[in-house]
């Protein structure tokens, strides 16, 4: 099997470089779901369904209603997914948008 092991973070700021890490967890999906993620099995299932595409995981539904304030929340994923190196970063405009778009993967 190809390894899948990640470190996931959530921070307050426009980019990972500008923000402090507020929360961080580990997520391993093969050979079995594990790590410090509170729902490792659910997060791995969601990532597998998305084919490891984090943009699909963080996609916000078009009918989401949030304020238009700029109070950015950034999420990151670093590590290996299905044997490929991953370095992912996504910035949500505010905590409401982050809650709407983080999916199970960034729910910690």
Curated annotation (Swiss-Prot):
The record marks 68-69 as: Reactive bond. InterPro entries: Prot_inh_I16_SSI (IPR000691), Prot_inh_SSI_I16_CS (IPR020054), Subtilisin_inhibitor (IPR023549), Subtilisin_inhibitor-like_sf (IPR036819). The keyword Disulfide bond applies. SUPFAM superfamilies: Subtilisin inhibitor (SSF55399). One of its GO terms (molecular function) is serine-type endopeptidase inhibitor activity. It is found in: Secreted. This is Protease inhibitor SIL-V3. It comes from Streptomyces eurocidicus.
